[in-house]
Amino acid sequence: MVLLQVKRGDELIFLYETSVKEKTDTVLRELVALHNGQLKIQRVCMEIEELAEHGTMVPPEMIGLNEEQREELKLKDVWADKCIPSGGFTINKDPLLRRNGQQPTEAMQKVLAGAMNDAKAMVDRRLAKSSKTLTPKIVEEALNLLRGGVTIVYPMQLPPHDSIRMEFTNTEDLTGTQASKEVIEPSKAQFWFAGHQMLMGKLMSDYLGHNDKTKVVVKLNQIGEGPPGREAVISDPLRRQMMAEAYRRQEELKKLEQDDDDEYLNSSWADSGSLKRQAHGLENVRFRFRK
């Protein structure tokens, strides 16, 4: 199987296994679904943190209004009495005025926290550095963990306008949010290899060759974003090492310019036999003669 190191910009977001015989359309569609799935889980977890602190969301027309304003406008959250967390709640008002302030019990908060931690661990971008691949099944299992945790705490479900429930039913509206800039629209998706766009209607082998045991970097973006930057020819650690070596050499040359004698002949790089001794492992060999 070909191992794709999938990046968004310069960030490695996950590893994905495929075949050189697979169609580019199929691969791109799945890569976009995995990327957007990662983002969905991040968004849901952020909202569940708020749910554990301040309860369910108030209706859209009440968001941002304090109690006096709601009373003045005769607005009431009819879902507050229907969507009560298991074990009851305590009042913890939401400073952002988005949620009803009915905080679940400590035990139920732990249920939500456990589901969040497990789900985030399953799709963590750092897994790519541990050579662990991401699959649609893993993303779906992570979402099911979150659904299960929320259902335990809210057996009567969340209000239909709650952003968590909307995420679960894929009816979320991200218009005007920062999240909307991160999500890739499938119809506008592109992916690139070695500075070249991988076009639809092709096979992966058209770009990667027929070796099914290789590892390559591909980059995701959208129409209008332009070609992503090429991968660096050398890695950052190697680049830093080369710069340090160049600096050391420069300092040594400066020192030689200040010397009036032949001290440079004592330097290892000036010894014509040094490279040969290194190749044969004789660099630090010393001979001791007995009388």
UniProtKB/Swiss-Prot annotation:
A Pfam match is: CFAP298
InterPro entries on file: CFAP298
> Which parts of the chain are coiled coil?
none
> A GO biological process this protein is involved in?
regulation of cilium movement
Q: What family does the database annotate?
A: Belongs to the CFAP298 family.
In terms of PANTHER family, this protein maps to: CILIA- AND FLAGELLA-ASSOCIATED PROTEIN 298, PROTEIN C21ORF59
**Could you identify this protein by its name?**
Cilia- and flagella-associated protein 298
Its organism's taxonomic lineage begins at: Eukaryota, Metazoa, Ecdysozoa, Arthropoda, Hexapoda
